């Protein structure tokens, strides 16, 4: 298994709407690497574009440990509906290290998605899992938590965001010069 590099705010792939996954043949290897990467970074969720992959795929483990079996895999997900009261909760993001913002989201979400075996499901999720699903679906649509808060909150982290953006541009230039 491999730990993949997590790309940060400022990398163009994070602002793209991710493509549907058509071929599930090698998906388990990618999923395994994504879980390794997420656990290494001490996250509870990870979208494929956060590791540089343009695909509608994300994983979640709200237990935050490798030992527990609370893993969730969502392929070609789309939000069918959002229900319940809006709730405010502090969210962080592996692509925006050091930044945590109070984000308002609906209490529950209904998601249509595929599993790695190709089966389609439509389920309702609430609590931390429901919130994490909404967060990761935002990633797959090019949306960050910073886009979900007001201007006053965004200004508080302006310096950190500019630094992340600058570092991402430098990393992309370096990779380009090396032929990646």
Model regions and ranges:
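Positively charged
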Residues: 1-180
């Amino acid at each position: 298994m491999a730990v993949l590099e997590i790309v940060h705010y400022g990398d163009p792939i994070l602002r793209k709407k991710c493509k549907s996954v058509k071929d599930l043949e090698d998906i388990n290897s990618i999923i395994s690497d994504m879980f390794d990467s997420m656990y290494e970074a001490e996250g509870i969720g990870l979208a494929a574009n956060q590791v540089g992959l343009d695909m509608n795929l994300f994983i979640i483990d709200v237990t935050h440990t490798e030992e527990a079996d609370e893993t969730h895999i969502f392929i070609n997900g789309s939000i069918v509906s959002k229900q319940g009261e809006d709730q405010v909760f502090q969210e962080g993001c592996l692509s925006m290290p050091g930044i945590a913002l109070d984000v308002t989201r609906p209490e529950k979400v209904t998601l249509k998605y595929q599993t790695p075996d190709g089966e389609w499901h439509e389920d309702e999720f609430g609590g931390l899992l429901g919130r994490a699903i909404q967060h990761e679906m935002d990633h797959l649509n090019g949306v960050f938590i910073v886009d979900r808060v007001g201007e006053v909150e965004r200004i508080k982290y302006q310096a950190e965001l500019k630094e992340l953006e600058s570092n991402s541009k430098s990393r992309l230039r370096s990779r380009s010069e090396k032929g990646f």
